[in-house]
Amino acid sequence: MAKTPQAHHESERRIKRAFKRKGWSEVKANDSWAIFKVMSEFVMGFEAMQRIRPCVSIFGSARTKPDHPAYKLAEEIAFQLTGNGYGVITGGGPGIMEAANKGAQRGGGTSVGLNIDLPFEQQPNPYIDKEKSLDFDYFFVRKVMFIKYSQGFVVLPGGFGTLDELFEALTLIQTQKIGRFPIILVGKKYWQGLLDWIRVVMGEENSNIDVNDLDLFSVVDKPEEAVAVINKFYSKYMLKPNF
């Protein structure tokens, strides 16, 4: 649904206020104090996340509407994950994130939301367990929580933010900064163009990745396939934080 002109102008004003240009003197004065804010977010996140049961993170577009097939797919994946003993972690917002939290609650499982404060005022969706809705100012702190406490990543169609989370995990596993865990792309048709480019342009034509790097993730279409990949992995390995 298109924004009204009034809503569009208000959105622009919020963004401009959020990104108001700062002089170097103000930046230098604030940088040292920002360390304490970063530390407090890590402490808050670690203390909250270490108390949850094993969880799988589900990623995808915040723009996906409830009547979209991907929304239904995310909800069903989360529902089936809870039936297999996993909780669900999302970015806490609307769209795919909302669908996944909804599916987790429908299944009676743990439903965690790691919300990020944005100029666009993203609000946590209503399907997050009350004591498990966490707010972050810093994307990089939030990423650490996803990486450390997820037993798997399930990645549905999304945009730049979804790709950011996907490639962060792939990079850390590829460089052996963390151990391997299941990464599952859902929607073969959606991901095929990107995967062809990675395989052909990055791999075959330029040798910028190893052919074995393509084995770091799985591609599926159905909820039960995604859950099966995770269950198969943890039939061999122990459930634990990734670092």
Task: Please report, for each region that a protein language model flagged, where it lies by residue.
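Active-site/ligand-binding-proximal alpha/beta "capping" segment
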Residues: D137-K189, Y234-L239
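Structural motif
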Residues: C55-S57, G87, G109-G113, E131-S133, ...
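C-terminal functional extensions of proteins
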Residues: L185-F243
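Short glycine-rich anion-binding loops that position phosphate/pyrophosphate groups of nucleotides
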Residues: S61-T64, D117-P119, G158-G161
